[in-house]
Every structure is written in structure tokens, then in C-alpha cells.
């Protein structure tokens, strides 16, 4: 079985973070890594959103996302950042990849991803949009890409 983790960098909304914990359980992601200003468990006021999945999904917190990304790369994880970028590949291409170790990177919707994170990424993933908006809610985007993994 693949080793799948997701890294959330400075995501502001607790509801989105806890929704991603719930998505992680559904999509067989074994760990959620929280970095920067992302809120961390335990939070009884919001645990219902995740159906308490934060109690059994492993999670770690790092103040610096680069520290853990570099560690994951040394451990042979492929880093996939989700971002609209000239180097982006369509998320559906993930269905055809057979990587054993993957880490999805999601970030604050307003501040966008840090360029250094993009530079450390093995692939940059995009979810094509049909109309005028160029972004999705972070928990929705995470769910779509997690499904493709």
C-alpha cells in the first residue's frame, strides 16, 4: 500500500483543517502534517467537523514547512503541490502515477503557496476550472486531489 500524507501550510480556517482530517481518513492518507499558522488539535469546539478523525489520524506540527519537506524528500517522498502554475499538470495524471510515497501540499488560499515550496515540489498539480474562478475551497481541492492519489 502507498504511503500518503498531506501537508497543510498556514491554512487559517479550522473548519477546513478538520474537514481535511476527515478526508484523510476516507482517502487512506495516514498522516496530516500541519505547518506555520495552521491550527492544531485538540479542539473540542470543532472536532465534530472531522467526526473526531483527528483522534486516530496521525498528525505532526512543524513551524517551518521547509524542514519537513526536505526531510520527506530525503525519505523518498514525492512532493505534489496543488497550485495554478505554468509547470502544473492536470490532477487526473495522478491516477496514472504509481509512486509509493507521496505528500500533497496545500496552503493558505489567500497568501498562495511559497515559491520555495514550489521549487522543492516534484510535481505541481492543477484542478482545471470551467468558468471564471481560478480556485476552490482548500478542503474541496484537497478532496479532489486526494481521490486521484
For every predicted segment, state its role.
Residues 1-149:
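Post-transcriptional modification and biogenesis factors for structured RNAs
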Amino acid at each position: 500500500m502507498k504511503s500518503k500524507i498531506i501537508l497543510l501550510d498556514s491554512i487559517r480556517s479550522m473548519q477546513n483543517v478538520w474537514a481535511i482530517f476527515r478526508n484523510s481518513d476516507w482517502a487512506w492518507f495516514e498522516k496530516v502534517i500541519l505547518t506555520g499558522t495552521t491550527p492544531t488539535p485538540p479542539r473540542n469546539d470543532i472536532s465534530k467537523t472531522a467526526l473526531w478523525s483527528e483522534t486516530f489520524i496521525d498528525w505532526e506540527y512543524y513551524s517551518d514547512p521547509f524542514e519537513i519537506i526536505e526531510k520527506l524528500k530525503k525519505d523518498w517522498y514525492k512532493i505534489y503541490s496543488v497550485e495554478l502554475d505554468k509547470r502544473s499538470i492536470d490532477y487526473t495524471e495522478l491516477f496514472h502515477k504509481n509512486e509509493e510515497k507521496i505528500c500533497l501540499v496545500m496552503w493558505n488560499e489567500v497568501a498562495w503557496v511559497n515559491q520555495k515550496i514550489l521549487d522543492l515540489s516534484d510535481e505541481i498539480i492543477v484542478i482545471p476550472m470551467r468558468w471564471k474562478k481560478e480556485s476552490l475551497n482548500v478542503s474541496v481541492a484537497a478532496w479532489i486531489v486526494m481521490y486521484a492519489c
